[in-house]
């Protein structure tokens, strides 16, 4: 009779295809609220603000992007940019500069003095229309009667085309006088765009409580 030899039995390792891979890292969601070169500031659903860096060029995010990011100590890494509704950008012969995403409207702020460029205004309007973003034109410095009257007259063709135009005196206006602009912005995600000297900082500081302190904090 044949004898069966007893051999020690060792568990076989599973093939490579059956081995369990480590679970993917847990990602948090957030909104990009500021951009500074190669990093940005992401606001979480509970109001925290975290400095995040992109994972390669494909994860490059702009203000207004909804992102998924991975925490790492006191900073984070952006792993994915969610699908955008739109992207406001400027393109020339050299490069494309992205400003913001997922916008409801663009407020184009110009001033009676210094004289605004109709070419720049038209380019901004075309960029907004191309992405189906509503443009709003605000002409600042209505407290300067002569230059304001001339500037308002130059804007007549834009009024005739149906664009919304609003006069303003951002430094001198009372809160009540600024209410029409506030009503236009209420509940909407808006990009404020304009040349140097048009009053962008004044507008934001007048309309957004604590904006000056927040800007100073992010800059530091």
Residue ranges and their predicted role:
Residues 1-118:
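N-terminal accessory targeting/assembly segments
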Residues 119-130, 134:
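Histidine-anchored nucleotide/phosphate-binding helix
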Residues 33-49, 55-72, 178-220:
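Conserved G1/Walker A P-loop phosphate-binding module
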Residues 103-109, 132-142, 162-168:
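Conserved beta-strand/loop subsegment of P-loop NTPase cores
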Residues 113-114, 143, 219-220:
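Flexible beta-alpha connector loops of hexameric P-loop NTPases
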Residues 64, 128, 140:
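Residue-level signal for inorganic ion chemistry
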Residues 144-198:
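Canonical P-loop GTPase G-domain recognition
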């Amino acid at each position: 009779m044949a004898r069966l030899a007893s051999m020690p039995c060792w568990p076989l390792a599973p093939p490579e295809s059956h081995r369990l891979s480590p679970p993917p890292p847990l990602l948090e969601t957030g909104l990009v609220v500021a951009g500074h070169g190669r990093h940005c500031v992401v606001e979480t659903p509970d109001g925290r603000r975290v400095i995040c860096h992109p994972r390669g060029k494909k994860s490059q995010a702009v203000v207004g992007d909804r992102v998924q990011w991975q925490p790492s100590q006191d900073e984070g890494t952006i792993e994915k940019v969610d699908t955008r509704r739109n992207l406001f950008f400027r393109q020339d012969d050299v490069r494309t500069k992205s400003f913001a995403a997922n916008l409801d409207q663009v407020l184009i702020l110009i001033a009676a003095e210094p004289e605004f460029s109709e070419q720049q205004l038209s380019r901004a309007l075309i960029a907004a229309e191309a992405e189906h973003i509503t443009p709003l034109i605000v002409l600042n410095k209505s407290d300067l009667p002569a230059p304001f009257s001339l500037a308002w007259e130059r804007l007549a063709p834009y009024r005739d085309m149906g664009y919304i135009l609003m006069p303003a005196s951002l430094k001198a206006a009372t809160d009540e006088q600024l209410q029409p602009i506030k009503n236009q912005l209420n509940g909407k995600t808006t990009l404020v765009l304009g040349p140097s000297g048009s009053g962008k900082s004044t507008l934001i500081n007048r309309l957004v409580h604590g904006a000056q302190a927040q800007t100073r904090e992010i800059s530091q």
